[in-house]
């Protein structure tokens, strides 16, 4: 039985090793986290979780410098629901609260920017990217990002809006 997502909800696309970056004042108090970005038929979900990927697997999700619309192998809706329950830093954004999905270039790097309204009807913005290098001490944080083409994800998100 699922607790966080509906029984008729299913994963449309998911990407591993994604870093989220919050904007505004909340971004000042929010450390970037690595996790899984999942799009279901009802929600956009980010779950902080470290996954180890081999280079062949990396090509499946980020080959040709494109964020591909695929599903994680061996990652089901039950796993997603369990990860949401385990990590309090997870967030769920209903697709009807999405305002915009766009690609933003900052310092020669393309980020996926999601704008949505939270429960208090305030606009929130998050950027998503994958990293080239990460510093692990004192806390795991990204240093440099890959510049990806997010067109497929943007089109998919806009089709769900």
Question: Can you name each region flagged by the protein language model?
Answer:
Residues 32-34, 45-161:
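Acidic, Ser/Thr- and proline-rich intrinsically disordered linker/docking segments
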Residues 2-31:
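The phosphoinositide-binding surface of pleckstrin homology
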Residues 35-39:
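Broad, structure-driven detector of short, well-ordered beta-strand segments within folded domains
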């Amino acid at each position: 039985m699922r607790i966080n997502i509906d029984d008729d909800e299913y994963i449309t696309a998911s990407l591993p090793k994604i870093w989220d970056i919050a904007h505004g004042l909340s971004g000042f108090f929010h450390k970037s986290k690595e996790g899984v970005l999942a799009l279901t038929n009802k929600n956009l979900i980010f779950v902080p979780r470290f996954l180890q990927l081999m280079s062949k697997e990396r090509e499946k999700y980020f080959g040709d410098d494109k964020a591909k619309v695929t599903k994680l192998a061996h990652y089901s809706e039950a796993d997603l629901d369990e990860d949401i329950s385990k990590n309090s830093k997870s967030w769920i954004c209903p697709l009807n609260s999405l305002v915009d999905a766009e690609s933003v270039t900052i310092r020669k790097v393309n980020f996926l920017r999601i704008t949505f309204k939270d429960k208090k009807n305030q606009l929130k913005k998050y950027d998503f990217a994958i990293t080239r290098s990460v510093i692990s001490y004192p806390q795991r944080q990204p240093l440099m990002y890959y510049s990806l083409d997010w067109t497929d994800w943007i089109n998919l998100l806009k089709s769900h809006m």
